[in-house]
Amino acid sequence: MAIGDKRKKNRKNKQNKKNKNDNELILLHNTNNKLINSNSLVNSNNKNNNNKNGNGGGVNVMVNQCYNVLNGSFLFGSFFNKFDVLFNYLKSFLTIQKQSLNVNKLTDSNITISQKDNITFSTNSNNNNNSTNGNSNSPSIIIQQQQQHHHFNESQSSNNNNNNGSSLSSLGGSYITVDDLNDQLKIVQLEQKIVNLEKEIQRMRNEQNQIHKQNLNQYHELLKQIINAASLIQQQPTSIIQQPPQPFVAPPPPPPPPPPMVFKPKPIVVQPVSTPSSSSNSLASKKSNGVPQFSISMADITGVKLRKTSSKFAQSNSSPSRVNGSPARNRVVTSPAGIKKSPFKRVLTPVKKSATTTTTSSSSNNATTTTAKGSTSTPLKDITNSNNIKNSVLSPKSITKPNTPSNIIFSPLSNNNNNASPYKPLTISTLR
């Protein structure tokens, strides 16, 4: 494209911008005229003052502020955004004027005002011209608190009724209620508190940073000391650290053994032995109560004589069962007292009773066996192995009488030496 075409386009853009600015200014003048009319209605009693205020700096300040809001890049998209901002600002300004109408209707005669706040809108035209970015500056509100104590006398109260209505007028012709002033004061106080809190937070941060730096310095110093100690240990030869001998500690004594269980000895029941009257009386006199005792006197030993029977069973045609009947019926043992007892009861008798002569059943075990042809039987040996007893060979002819228990059993009380038996009486000495 040629350079001339670019210039033409730039001129057209500039003209469009100027036309937009003119239209915006026309809108602003119309709004200002409406505001002036509203101010004239409010202050109908003081027309001259209201006209001066309307033509004065109040409206011009608003126009300049609106112009500053719109000052900058006048693009088509940003225009509507800035127009909305301006519309909201004007809307809030109109609400303030409506509240001021209610204040002017107060007809109280005695009104004392302790605080009079004037809101002035300052234009920062110099700052806007010097701004390079072209950003719009929001209107700055300066709250001036002027404490003016008006003391009215009773005589002058009637003359100053008209002036009380106009006491709330500001320099710009706008009216602000007392509630709004209180709210603004609270806002200012809150802002001051926020500033103080920010300062305290900053102070706390600075203290924490200092503590952190101190901790870092201590940490680095400790690291240096550790490194120096490690280097010294590596340079020196390693020495075996001998630990001192630990003192000998005796082991604790073992726990005492538990007490033994006490068992009561069971009483030994001794059955009484059936003995002769003379021996039983002597034994009973020697026994103590509850203690079993067993004692034998020499008289008991010498009074007993042990003998061995010499009965032999002959090898004959007749059996003992034919001659004398069954041997089981005739097995009778005579005691020294002359009482007959069976051999089965004799087994259960004590040692003293067992010293008597044996029965035919015991002697039958020692009998010799003979052949059927009548050959001689082998001799019987003495059980006691005594030297005084001779071995004799018995033949069937030597037996004159049949083998009966009466002939075989001898009484121990007989002291005759002319007995048919060749055996001598057995005593304890011979048994040994």
Swiss-Prot record:
Cellular component aspect of the GO annotation:
cytoplasm
Q: Where is the composition biased (Basic residues)?
A: 1-18
Which stretches are tagged as biased composition: Low complexity? 37-53, 122-147, 154-168, 274-288, 352-378
Q: Which residues form a coiled coil?
A: 181-226
Specify where the region named Disordered lies, as residue ranges: 1-23, 37-56, 122-168, 270-290, 310-432
Keywords in alphabetical order, please: Coiled coil
- Keyword Iron set for record: no
Locations of Polar residues compositional bias? Answer: 311-324, 383-414
Keyword hit for Transcription regulation: no
What protein does this entry describe?
Putative uncharacterized protein DDB_G0285869
Question: Lineage of the native species?
Answer: Eukaryota, Amoebozoa, Evosea, Eumycetozoa, Dictyostelia
